[in-house]
Regions:
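Metallo-beta-lactamase
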Residues: 1-79
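C-terminal regulatory/interaction regions
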Residues: 83-152
Length: 152
């Protein structure tokens, strides 16, 4: 929501300043990560003197700098996803997520809280969908209905 007279934007969870919003795959939504990236670029064009996230706080950070950080984060996450798919071809999103770089509370993937693994796998699928839409990876569904990813 943008209030033009005050150059004020209510960001919701779209831009959070001290954590990265979880961009996940949604049934019926093609390439949710691409939608998010395009939306970040679009809101970056607004003049914002005040940017208000739905929760947490801005930590005094400039909204434009934060948008740039989020775009860089997803660029790095895409590179990490592609690297892991190359390393373990014909793998599931869960297997790929286990090899990716996360800020974890546990020492390893198995100690990562199950709810956080759920978020990580959803985000991994969103990044795989993006790479698939760009023609970088392909998804094959095996005889048991399991989605498996390989580089093209």
């Amino acid at each position: 929501l943008y209030y033009e007279k005050k150059n004020l934007m209510f960001l919701g969870d779209h831009v959070l300043f001290d954590i990265t919003p979880n961009i996940t795959a949604w049934f019926g939504v093609k390439d949710s990560l691409n939608n998010y990236i395009n939306s970040l670029k679009k809101i970056r064009e607004f003049k914002m003197d005040t940017a208000l996230p739905a929760h947490r706080n801005t930590k005094g950070m400039n909204v434009y700098d934060r948008i740039d950080q989020l775009l860089e984060h997803h660029k790095a996450r895409l590179a990490d996803t592609e690297k892991v798919v190359k390393m373990i071809p014909n793998s599931t999103a869960y297997e790929i997520a286990a090899y990716m770089k996360w800020q974890m509370r546990g020492k390893n993937w198995e100690e990562f809280p199950i709810s956080q693994r759920w978020f990580a796998v959803g985000e991994t699928i969103a990044h795989l969908d993006y790479l698939e839409a760009k023609g970088i990876v392909k998804c094959d569904i095996d005889s048991e209905g399991v989605h498996r990813y390989t580089l093209i």
